Amino acid sequence: AKERKEHRDTICCAAAQGLMSREESTQSKIVKLIQTYGETASTTLKEILSIYTETMLANTKKELKAYLENNEPEDSASFTYEPILPIIREDNRIQEITSTEDLIFLASQVLDVNEIYHFDLLLGALVKWDRQQEAKQISQWTPILQRAYKLLMSGGSSRNGILDQLMATFLLDYAKLLIKRFPEEAQELNNLHLKMVQKDELQKGKWGYRNLQKLTIREKTNKKIKFPVHKQLLCRTLDLLESKEKPLPLLSTPTHTPMFIAPETLIERLKQYQQTNAEPDDMDMQTALSRVALESSSQELPLLLRSLKGEYRHLLTFLLGEKDVLPQPPFNHPSWWMMAGLMKSPETIYSEFKDFSYNKSPREFLTGNFKWRTYQYTDSYTDYNKKTVEWICSTLTFDIPESENSHVINKDKYNERVSYYSYDPHPLLVEMYPQIERFDDIQNDLPRLAWLTPNIPEPLLVWCIRSAIYDPTLNEVREAGITQAAIEALHQLRHTWHEVSYLLEATCMLVADKTSRSYAAEIWIERVGQGCIDSGRIGSILSSHQHTGWGPLKRLTDLIQQQMINVSPLHNRELEKLIVAMLTGLPEKPVKDLKKLLEIYAELLSINHSKAEDEHVLHLLDAWKGVANLKKAVANIQR
């Protein structure tokens, strides 16, 4: 540019591309070049620079003010939040199964896991349409059963999980029911079964043996069942299909995506049980109560509730009513009431439930509100030269209370696990979750597990964190898969966040898996826009992590620069709150990569036209300005 005056404008325009980088050193060099050789009258240069205003640092904008159009956004003290769509809408209604043809088509897809709700939708559809199938349709089940056998014998696709194995086993039981009901038309199904049993017997004594001859979803075992809730729902469906009486609907079948139930539909289903004086299945009822959309404000709801009687009416009036509506007896089914109380307000202990056996258990197992902490410890290994090599590790853990029904086995060891059982013969749905940490490769099942209790996912998220998100260095396929599944589920869920949800969100901003970090940023962006997230709470958790070196701070600063800064004036205000809360909790001894965090903070103060005012942050800044590499960043904050 110095030598070729005729190309200065072109060179400045080309150099402007470097403003995509948020690095201060890079932008300052480009600013110097443009100020030296750029013409303020150049419309081409102005147009090019306008493209990069979103990635320009505040100081860069100030230096290049003469080259920029005056289009600064208005700074407003009040912000408009994006509207939160209601859960129950016409555009997210799950299409009903209205014929036997629809039923068979759905069954052909259920093992593909195309939709999260297909598993439950098939169960509800079978109960409704099974008896209406014609004999000529039975042969259409053969390819469906072929896929079920293949999944059980060879493991299925990379999208299949343990729940799909349970569904495949259930389909085998259903095929036996069809063979019994249509002996001639189902001959093809019977031949398929005999062929697969014969093939399986050749594997006897080997790893791939499945014992198809005796395999049933009702199999009794002394081993812990991996996913007992879904197994109970499958068994309940089979009971209804085998019953000679007109089957009643499953209560837990979702009506709206991803997996919600409209309150009006649940009331209509319960009316059918009420009219026939039939007892709902306990786990089916608990799951239905867990999935009901609590925000529904239908004007018809009070009228519909009056169509129920006794315990049904009192139960749903309590669950769907305002927060101050208290439970009214009779309490003939404690599991229903306890589950309704947890869905409505997990932090509230209702005195009306004081005699329930569930209260004997540590309440943390019901709410997921375990105390957590990060700490450092020294680990070591012996290398090839028989020399002991030590290093400092950081880990995230929960304090698990021990009692008569909860024990920590192999405490503080690599194979630590929790043993827990319910005091009640009807365990709560959330009491099933502690078993999950024992099993590998559950990422394909996690979304469906989370949607068992969409109004209170924290009891599940605790075990996801314990299972795969406890160490910031973990980036193996299993851990990354579980982390991604957990944070993606958090993105879809619509519950009110409690501590563990905030812990998962903040922790995923520091994990090794880049995809999970990106998800965490997207969740923050979306919830800030809707006004339903506490950024300061996230900052406090992040500072706690940094106290013990849990996760490199660079992962967070890179994430902020790439996705979280300059989304909107509102987001910049919230990001400032997050960083202030984080700085407040940091030690006086500078943590690694603190310089970049301070530079981002200085940038936000400039953008937001605000000043550092927190007394503890000001105290820390005074301490840090004596550190050579932090001096300039601190000066930019204090000016």
Put a short name on every predicted segment.
Residues 1-13, 26-31, 37-639:
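Alpha-helical structural signal with a strong bias for long, charge-/Ser/Thr/Gly-rich
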